[in-house]
Amino acid sequence: MNVGKLQPVRGTRDLLPEECYKFWHIRDVAHDIGERYGFVPVETPIFEFQDVFLKTLGDSSDIIGKEMYSFPDRGGDVLVLRPELTAAVARMLICERLTLPARLFTFGPVFRYERPQKCRQRQFHQINYEHFGAGCTADAELMALAYDILGALNLRSEVQLEINSLGNQDSILGYRNSLLKYFEKHEHALSEDSRRRLQTNPLRILDSKDRGDIAILCGAPVIADFYDDESNMTFNGVMQQLDNLGIPYTVNPRLVRGLDYYCGTVFEFKTTSLGSQDAVIAGGRYDKLVASMGGGDVPAVGFAGGVERLASLAAYSHSTRFSVAFLPLGEEAARCAMRSAYELRGRGIRVLCDGVVEKLKIGLKHADRSGVDLALILGDEEIAKGEVLCRHMDTGLQQTVSISNLGDYVSGMESNAQGNNRAALSSAGE
């Protein structure tokens, strides 16, 4: 096989143990804090019918225009690898007839055909929260949830919350028409992407990272000029709630989201540490999404967080749990080790048992590299006496223990190790 074909596909990558542990830590933090806010876990399939996204994300979105992985199946249907989670969860809400209000948490990979760069891959992972049947008071609550996650990951100092409101459908339509007139006057100076967006959805130009476009945006109209009284009152209410919660924010009048289903409040937690990929957590309100899929009028708000981006910012070191390794020096010792390992695992102990060790010195080196706490040495002499030689890997101290008492001995060692870890964590927090 061609060696090049053994590499991960461009835009994807392998996750080694330390990074897996970090991802799982972020997932567990997100799930734990989500539960405090009443969110329950759900999962949707990795691939869906193409219409789930075509009818919801908008023809003008980059995802629909050039980023979806789509393919026909043998039955003639066009399927896609999910490019985001919100529409998929909304589809599930309708299909499974979930009771409202519904607070749903998801975690998993999504796929977009983008130009790979730092913290932007073609397969990436998201934590995702959707609150269906949510009134406007939920907007600030979702931002508080995100703020708590960032706090648990010690990232609040790394990010800034930016908020805006798109108002209602009349606001968006009026603003869109005003932007169209403004950008048409500057069309010759716009980037190629922005000229394309001018014909599909001029609001998307506000997202441009092109320097020339940014200069033009300085004189563009702002959506606040198109709010009606209700939109003004709603957005002011969201800001008052954030003030009441003590969550710092700035209003960014140019902030829009990249998908057409957004309306009302939108928000992003941004960082300056990841270059152009500055949005770490982002979301907003999408009151018409479920209706656009045939599910009735269901107000909703949600957000997604990029796990790779959070992992790039967060400091995390996995604490290896207490573990032991058997080093049997013969076939009979190996059989005894296998039985003992099975019993220890039944007690919840992490045990490595790889069969006969040809040379004890090599076995000890392997145990040391594996990071185990105890090496349990079994030779003919130990088998004859019904004993195990326990070597403490940190000190080199060796102690003989009867095989019948091995479970209690190792369990006691594990309890002591856990107690020391808790004491160290407590001391570090003082």
Swiss-Prot record:
EC number: 6.1.1.21
UniProt GO molecular function: ATP binding; histidine-tRNA ligase activity
Compartments where located: Cytoplasm
PROSITE patterns xrefs: AA_TRNA_LIGASE_II
Main location: cytoplasm
This protein's GO CC annotations: cytoplasm
EC class (word): ligase
Domain of life: Bacteria
Entry-linked Gene3D superfamilies: Anticodon-binding domain, Bira Bifunctional Protein, Domain 2
SUPFAM superfamilies the record matches: Class II aaRS ABD-related (SSF52954), Class II aaRS and biotin synthetases (SSF55681)
Keywords recorded for this protein, A-Z: Aminoacyl-tRNA synthetase, ATP-binding, Cytoplasm, Ligase, Nucleotide-binding, Protein biosynthesis
Gene Ontology BP term (one): histidyl-tRNA aminoacylation
CDD domains: HisRS-like_core
Entries under InterPro entries matching the protein: aa-tRNA-synth_II, aa-tRNA-synth_II/BPL/LPL, Anticodon-bd, Anticodon-bd_dom_sf, His-tRNA-ligase, HisRS-like_core, HisRS/HisZ
Reactions listed under catalytic activity: tRNA(His) + L-histidine + ATP = L-histidyl-tRNA(His) + AMP + diphosphate + H(+)
Family: Belongs to the class-II aminoacyl-tRNA synthetase family.
Subunit structure: Homodimer.
Protein name according to UniProt: Histidine--tRNA ligase
Taxonomic classification: Bacteria, Pseudomonadati, Pseudomonadota, Alphaproteobacteria, Rickettsiales
Gene this chain is encoded by: hisS
